[in-house]
């Protein structure tokens, strides 16, 4: 694949060095992860105040037929699992609701819980760099250049621990409805809990990446979560390969993907 100046700049920002092959042969770009500083450990979160913790209750009914405003309200008011007692706020999702691309992550971290938006902080900066290298963004843009970003869980697990099965089960209908409303042409599943929810697979990400899966007829590409890549920068080049696979898959469906 030939890189343009924008893509080279973004790859460098991701920490991936790119070399062109010698002129006498076919032109091939080889990406190699550059050394990166280890991500700082997140600061411990303050324990929630029992006086303000909401009482547990059933998940809102009728999720499968909700429109965007109703779905957002349902997520904000959900008390169906124990995570409701420790959240600052829910993290619904962000982006153009008609975006051609959808990114599905795992669970909010401390900064996401505080700001109410998925993928912020260093992992969000890395994700934005990855998306910009594909000509995509989470800000204002036409749907073909936009992504809608959501997490599998809408509330932060305490101490950034892994989600538990019942928590994933309670949040899953919200994610399913988000996908139904967006109607994306491509889904990027980032991390094993996104994979578990969308593909019903317990296989590790490393075994599922590198191929195109299907979710309800929508092409889905598995890749590493940006937080994982910050801890394991040697896998950034593999993540870039996954993004290129998704982009190639999109080209026949969306001419703008080749622009």
Regions found by a protein language model. Name each.
Residues 2-259:
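A polyanion-binding, active-site-adjacent surface
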């Amino acid at each position: 694949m030939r890189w343009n100046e924008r893509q080279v700049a973004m790859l460098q920002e991701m920490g991936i060095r790119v070399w062109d092959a010698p002129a006498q042969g076919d032109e091939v770009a080889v990406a190699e992860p550059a050394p990166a500083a280890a991500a700082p450990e997140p600061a411990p979160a303050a324990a929630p105040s029992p006086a303000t913790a909401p009482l547990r209750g059933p998940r809102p009914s009728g999720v499968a037929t909700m429109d965007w405003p109703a779905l957002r309200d349902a997520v904000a008011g959900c008390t169906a699992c124990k995570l409701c007692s420790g959240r600052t706020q829910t993290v619904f999702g962000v982006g153009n609701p008609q975006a051609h691309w959808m990114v599905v992550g795992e669970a909010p971290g401390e900064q996401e819980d505080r700001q109410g938006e998925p993928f912020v902080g260093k992992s969000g900066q890395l994700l934005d760099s990855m998306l910009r290298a594909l000509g995509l963004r989470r800000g204002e843009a036409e749907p073909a250049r936009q992504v809608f970003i959501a997490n599998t869980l809408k509330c932060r697990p305490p101490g950034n621990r892994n989600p538990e099965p019942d928590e994933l089960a309670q949040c899953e209908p919200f994610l399913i409805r988000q996908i139904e409303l967006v109607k994306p042409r491509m889904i990027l599943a980032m991390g094993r809990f996104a994979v578990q929810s969308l593909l019903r697979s317990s296989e590790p990400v490393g075994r599922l990446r590198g191929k195109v899966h299907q979710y309800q007829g929508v092409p889905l590409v598995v890749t590493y979560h940006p937080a994982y890549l910050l801890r394991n920068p040697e896998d950034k080049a593999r993540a870039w390969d996954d993004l290129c696979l998704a982009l190639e898959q999109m080209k026949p469906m969306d001419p703008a993907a080749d622009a």
